[in-house]
Amino acid sequence: MALWGGRFKQEADAKFKFFNDSLRFDYRLALQDIDGSIGWAKAITSVGILTEQEHQQLVVALKELRAEIESNIAIILRDDAEDIHSWVESKLIEKVGDLGKKLHTGRSRNDQVAVDMKMWCKVQAVVLQERIRNLQHKLVETAEANQNAVMPGYTHLQRAQPITFAHWCMAYYEMLERDFSRLTDAYKRMHTCPLGSGALAGTAYSIDRDALAQDLGFAIGTRNSLDSVSDRDHVLELLSTASISMVHLSRFAEDLIFFNSGESAFLELSDRVTSGSSLMPQKKNPDACELIRGKSGRVFGALSGLLTTLKGLPLAYNKDMQEDKEGIFDAMETWQACLEIGALVLEDINVNVERTREAAQQGYSNATELADYLVAKGIPFREAHHIVGEAVVYAISKREPLEALSVAEFKQFHPVIDEDVYPILSLESCLEKRSAKGGVNPERVREAIEAAKVNLGA
């Protein structure tokens, strides 16, 4: 039975009912709706709407219903209720009779869904932080195991300077750390409870909304009822954080796809996260990474969709706001899955250290070291940059690396170049020189790994 039928003389059209109903997706709020109802029962008992005996009856019934859902949430989807609020109320009435009809006193579905969504978002933030930490653990483990894997670093997808695979892993650790902190910040702003705001103007009963908030795991009640039932900032913040994180995960996946390709062959992804071709027997496709990269779009779409939905809404609640749910539900499931699969991809990754080193030795990635060498000899950097550019052109024409040029050949470009140039052109020297904080110097990378382990409690 609908919660609003008294005003109407005709039944809702079946097509409209399907269009309007939300139980098929907002069933995910079932536990939050029940917990919110338990809190509300206590609040209205405090102002004499319910007796203590009635309060206890309702709480027992609601907890029974909660247990039933936890054992089999699919029972909800067998019903044709309009939404999760209607479903919970109807099941409560089945258990306690007319007493169940008293629970909604002073409450609107507007503040009810607002608190349900905020409670759900709080749970999601915690779960997602756990998934982020798990992927960070895998990145640190992989970094620790591959500190000696020298590889080319890229700009413009061209070999730029030598790095290590460990340094690459720690770059994504840092991105995820920012994602983690954004969730922490978003969670802090979910500390206010909208329940008790009514439809838009507040409740007519003098309940202690701060006490209600604390019963439901919030710090305080919201300060403005109009804002309370209209606010979906917490949904937007989660979607925004998810979108930024999916950018990081997509780049992570793209790097691995490239590193795994035959063109680079820096590493091999495990059979556990790859698939084959129905036609080409030799293929081993990086589908896990490609799906992470591809799924970023649907998360971005959820954020864009909700921003567009909310931008022109007048205060307070409008049915448009029902459109906040499918996007956030899908986006959080997608983000969580991508974090989990990202960690799985790293479990059995096999880095080809010979190939990565060979690639690092190509592409003149030690050219910057030669420029720094000239600077140390008293030549201004801009001039040194030009000299090294000419030397690189010469080496390319000979199809040789810089370190293969003779001293006589080097002196064509500047007379200060001598035998002492060769040690600084080695890959080890290139790495060692980058010793400032955050650099690829092996000791700095080890320090970063140890600091990350402390941060993760490893």
Curated annotation (Swiss-Prot):
It comes from Actinobacillus pleuropneumoniae serotype 5b (strain L20). One of its GO terms (molecular function) is argininosuccinate lyase activity. Pathway: Amino-acid biosynthesis; L-arginine biosynthesis; L-arginine from L-ornithine and carbamoyl phosphate: step 3/3. InterPro entries: Arg_succ_lyase_C (IPR029419), Argininosuccinate_lyase (IPR009049), Fumarase/histidase_N (IPR024083), Fumarate_lyase_CS (IPR020557), Fumarate_lyase_fam (IPR000362), Fumarate_lyase_N (IPR022761), L-Aspartase-like (IPR008948). It is found in: Cytoplasm. This is Argininosuccinate lyase. Keywords: Amino-acid biosynthesis, Arginine biosynthesis, Cytoplasm, Lyase. CDD domains: Argininosuccinate_lyase. It comes from the Bacteria. Belongs to the lyase 1 family. Argininosuccinate lyase subfamily. GO terms for cellular component: cytosol. Its EC number is 4.3.2.1. It is an enzyme of class 4 (lyase). GO terms for biological process: arginine biosynthetic process via ornithine; L-arginine biosynthetic process. PANTHER family: ARGININOSUCCINATE LYASE (PTHR43814:SF1).
